[in-house]
Structures are given as C-alpha cells and as structure tokens.
C-alpha cells in the first residue's frame, strides 16, 4: 500500500428511538494481508428477532468469506457478490423460525493492500467517497423514491423526507434475488474518506454537510457528531443508526 498516507477509522452504532437494534456494522482487518480491510453495514428488517437475525447473518457471511479471501489471487468483485448471494440464501432459510420475514440491506467496501477499493451494495444503505469535503461518488438506492428521482418526479432533497422513503425495490431475504450494484476506485489517495452507513444516518444530512464533517473531523469525532446530529434531527422518531468511516490521512 502507498506510503503517502496512514489509515484511521471508526465505527458507530446506536438504536436511535427504536426499542431494539437491528443494524449491524463491522470493520475487519485481514489476518494475513496487512492493509486489506472490509467495512460493512447491514440494516435488518423483520420484527424484533427477524431483522437482527438477518443483519447478524450478513456479518457472519462477510467475516467468513473475507477470512478466505486472498488479495493477491482472488477477484474482489466476485467475493463481494458472493457475500450478498450467500447471505440472501441463508436469510431466506431463517425466515422459517422468525415471526416476520427477515430482510437486510448491505453496503460494503473492500480496500486491497495495493490501494484499490471495491464496493457492493443492495437496498438503501449507502456508500460514500469524498476527497476532502468534495463528494466523488455515492451509491444509488434500490428504493421506490429513487425511482421517482430517476424519473425527475422529485428531487434528491424531497426524497429524503418522502413518506414512502422506506419502501425498497430489493434487498437480502426478499422473494426475488437482490439487486447488486458495484463500484471500483482504482487508487485511493491521501485525503480520501470512505463511509458506509444505514438510512438512519444519511436521511438527515446533505452531501455538503456530510463532506464537511468527514473532512474536518477525525473518524471517531465524525462518527460521534453524525450520530448525535441525526438523533437531534430525528425529533424522537429516529431509526437505528450505523456507520463505518475510513480516512486516508497524508503523512506530509
């Protein structure tokens, strides 16, 4: 990995105003390949036990496949797709013992030792790439309101507060195979910031607000700030919140 930067990172999770936590988040460092890491967020749905079972299964599947992953020889996009495909199958099997059908979103980024980065997501948990405070790329939700945005019927700002913003067009555990979207960053640079987060976070911020917080604050400070501000803005009816932030800080 490039010696021009050092990596700092943080994860955060809060149940918001819900009675129980169905989000899960993790940042895994590869046991055999220094500089290889996987950041992942899963937002479970399906009652008290169903949603948590689903997001737990995402984390278990991701951990198992990441441990087997060999950066020097394996294909990163294929491994990320496999996480989605295998978690989807197992979540559907757990539906038998859950009081509601378990479902989950997934948003994950993989950083290889050489500095390339691969994304995968399904549902409305998001991935962001900022350089400094400038948004470089973010994922497009698999949601009903996103189809309205795509048609020009509503703006992105209106989508955030739309009453049907929680309707997904696909996710893990649904009847249909989940939609899978992937993205590739050939080379990460100093001052790049990556974030994966559930909708409990991104619903409450503009891209510019998020970019400012991520560029000015350390990952730990940004995690605490975004959770605190999202809690405040949700006015007592907030969703679970989860996020993982990785920042590449210049050594100069």
Give the residues covered by each predicted segment.
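PP2C/PPM-type serine/threonine phosphatase catalytic domain
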Residues: 1-252
